[in-house]
Amino acid sequence: MRLRALAKINLGLDILRKREDGYHEVRMIMQTIQMYDVLEIKKKKAPGISLSVNYPYIPCDERNLVYKAAKLLMDEFQVKGGVTIRLEKFIPVAAGMAGGSSDAAATLVGINRLFKLGLSERELMDRAVKIGADVPYCIMRGTALAEGIGEKLTGITQVPECFVLIGKPGINVSTRAAYESLNLSGIQNHPDIDGMIQDIQNGDLQGMTAKMGNVFEPGIIGQYPVIQEIKDLMESHGALKAMMSGSGPTVFGIFESQEKMDAAAKILRESNLAKTVFGTRVFNRI
């Protein structure tokens, strides 16, 4: 069984407060894009989980969310035998694009189908939050408002058709470190999440992009100015808006046409600002 694990971007990312349990209360608009990892899942007679990945530095044991996801369902339903899972990574690692969470989500979907466990999407999502806050959304996919710690999801009208250019510089940003360095009282500009939802519902791509924002940006760009350079390059070459996704360091630009996106991608590659450059489009459920 082959499955695609789609990357996500944050069209809007706001953080409201830090909770007593240490987690942060967020409001985000999430969007899947047509950039994906590929998983191949097969049954095997011997018990256990055999995981392999195309990058040798990625762990293949319980430190990997794919392994955790498979073990979660197989233990709960006392599945007979085991599975062999091959993960082909194409989504950049530690990029703010939920690659690991999406891999885990695809694993839950795959194990459910392979062993005919009969779980609904909602039942899978309820279990997914045990693995990570982004995993339920990666099962749901499409355009969604995420609240709470990211686990409270409301599907919204699909974002207008558009093209997305991904540019990841050759640096990694720890999500934990990004949260720890965030000064909540010092946030100057909060994205207009409600206004963005209204624009999405009205099919107003330009209105939506004008309101986009990510409260992580100022602090992370202060540490890594190359992120701002990539943003500026995209916006000066046709992007309606370029923004950092999640806690970074990946930058994405929203374009109205593939021609504009392809032209900007060529210039970005030639600039050597980004190690990964990838042009794609949004993925909508409908």
Regions from the PLM with identified roles:
Residues 140, 145-241, 256-262, 266-269, ...:
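Conserved, helical-rich catalytic subdomain that frames metal- and/or nucleotide-binding sites
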Residues 11, 39-41, 66, 100, ...:
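Residue-level signal for inorganic ion chemistry
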Residues 30-33, 128, 234, 268:
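Hydrophobic C-terminal alpha-helix "anchor/cap" residues
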